[in-house]
Amino acid sequence: MAKYFGTDGIRGEVANSTITAEFTQKLGNAVGSLINQKNYPKFVIVGQDTRSSGGFLKFALVSGLNAAGIDVLDLGVVPTPVVAFMTVKHRAAAGFVITASHNKFTDNGIKLFSSNGFKLDDALEEEVEDMIDGDFIYQPQFKFGSYKILANAIDEYIESIHSRFAKFVNYKGKVVVDCAHGAASHNFEALLDKFGIDYVSIASNPDGLNINVGCGATCISNIKKAVKEQKADLGISLDGDADRIIIVDENGQEIDGDGILNILAQYSDICGGTNGIVGTQMTNMSYENHYRANKIPFIRSKVGDRYVLEDLVKYGYKIGGESSGHVINLNFGTTGDGLFTAIQLLAIFSQADKPVSEFKLQGELMQQTLINVPLAKKVTREDLQKVASDVNDVEKRLGNRGRVLLRPSGTEPVLRVMVEADDKSLATNEAEYLVEKVKQKLV
């Protein structure tokens, strides 16, 4: 089991967990030393979101890298996918993002990309963890690394998207965008301006403490309200580092990551094409049935965009994502990208010329009840075995009417209990039954 890395990098409460200046400096030094060992280019890229803790953590990271002889190019406040994009474009050995994504401002973390723009695999994460716990290494003969700032890094990313989609995007509707007071603030607006979109921006005034507070992709009541007030045709909500996207239609109704994938699958020719879709264990069964009926190959990965990416590569598909709004298109990028996904959707909506609500899957979706159960420590396989018989009982009662998923969070001590069924009360009752069993046996 990983000591520091979760499903999406390293994350925790600032100063009260792993996320300290001391640890972050060791992380930078460990990765820098590993770069030297493997003879990779002695050059990395860093970026951050809008959290107040981002500055001191970034410079701690940079000091560890510089001590190991690694040059650092700082992009400033940019969305996570921009760091992945620039890492590949500028042929850096790695890319770092100081972010805790959709978490509250008191948390922070580090996402780490390899030279190909992919998140590290488990084996490489283990190597990094071993080196973190080793000696701090200084580059001999004073061959320390340099530190430079790249102003307007977002421009290269925007131009790349614009060159691909300018001929498709001619959207005439009114759009509301929620930037979660995060890394998309001003950056997303610059992208929309490039395409001539008529938009109203909310939650785009970061102060270091308001990231994700009552806004963003994990609090869509904000965008729903704004769409109705503005009489808009579309709402787009991103999270703190802009690797997630959730949209709402002209009626203020949510279309989550599953729904977005379904839209991309229907119009994949505009998005570069794909011969299959990768969802996750959380993907609603209604979409799986829909793909099967339309002869679109569909695979479920483990939850986490890194696992979606692994299966995209394994099966040779191009488009995949999660219910939570991580959407990957390997025709363009290598990680969840809320901004690029938004432009793909605007291209589709421009070409199809019908209300956003008409792009939704027709008919009732299977009903999902998801309950997060806080625990004292991270959940182990042994813990799950303690409630295996209870899960089996629920599965027997559901029969072919639904399914059960118990999933430990990869970033915090939480067990996610999900029951899906063709009836909401059935899903809720069975989920609550399992939550009680979890509390009895694991809390």
UniProtKB/Swiss-Prot annotation:
Enzyme Commission number(s) of this protein: 5.4.2.10
Any Gene Ontology CC annotation: cytosol
InterPro entries: A-D-PHexomutase_a/b/a-I, A-D-PHexomutase_a/b/a-I/II/III, A-D-PHexomutase_a/b/a-II, A-D-PHexomutase_a/b/a-III, A-D-PHexomutase_C, A-D-PHexomutase_C_sf, Alpha-D-phosphohexomutase_SF, GlmM_bact
Entry PTM: Activated by phosphorylation.
Catalytic activity, as annotated: alpha-D-glucosamine 1-phosphate = D-glucosamine 6-phosphate
Entry keyword Cytoplasm: no
Listed GO MF terms: magnesium ion binding; phosphoglucosamine mutase activity; phosphomannomutase activity
Residue(s) carrying Phosphoserine: 101
Keyword tags: Isomerase, Magnesium, Metal-binding, Phosphoprotein
Cofactor list: Mg(2+)
Active-site residues, record numbering mapped to chain: 101 (phosphoserine intermediate)
GO BP annotations listed: carbohydrate metabolic process; peptidoglycan biosynthetic process; UDP-N-acetylglucosamine biosynthetic process
Transmembrane stretches, start-end: none
Functional note: Catalyzes the conversion of glucosamine-6-phosphate to glucosamine-1-phosphate.
NCBIfam families linked to this entry: glmM, PRK10887.1
Protein name: Phosphoglucosamine mutase
